[in-house]
């Protein structure tokens, strides 16, 4: 069996819309979706955590679509940047460059990136709870390593199509030179210490930090799958292991420094008492 993680932001009809992921359309008339099994899907978003079909049907619970969740997140975190950039455009008399938060959500450079996780095919897969456990552990590790600059906005476990799979959407961000938080992928990855695949060569389409980041994510996923007893077909993932080992080394050094500082403080306290 294969474990796959595919990423993208847009297709021939423009940027991907999260309505497909949280089933905000008439599933009864969709050929590839089993409407009855759709009630078993599991959803998660960054504001409410886990939700289910039953949660949506409860009139006492606030119901927000993934589209609304992403809009709220972008307004909360990037509105100040949009306003400040528009003000700078007015100063330089280039108001044609003005943008809105909605524009950030529609532009394929600043909109959320979508990842699809799947193990196996229609003929051979793993139980949904196994996929759920593996990907949930992956998200915890993802947050630990990248959470300062990459934010998971929402995800859905689909059990209503041929093979169980998960659609997840995230945004890369960091501060620009004006100190404003804004969506920017390459700069966010640089801030996280993600190296170029070939550091000695110039950055470009075939040599960028996103390639290393994706390799790191694949390495983490396969490590977690192995812990669950799965031995999956794996293509070489160059750079992923090196980055993780480097991060573990940095963390170990930080712990050693903290322990040394705490010991020094204890010694100072003892000196004062004596």
Where are the regions that the model predicts?
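N-terminal nicking endonuclease/strand-transfer module with a His-rich metal-binding environment
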Residues: 1-272
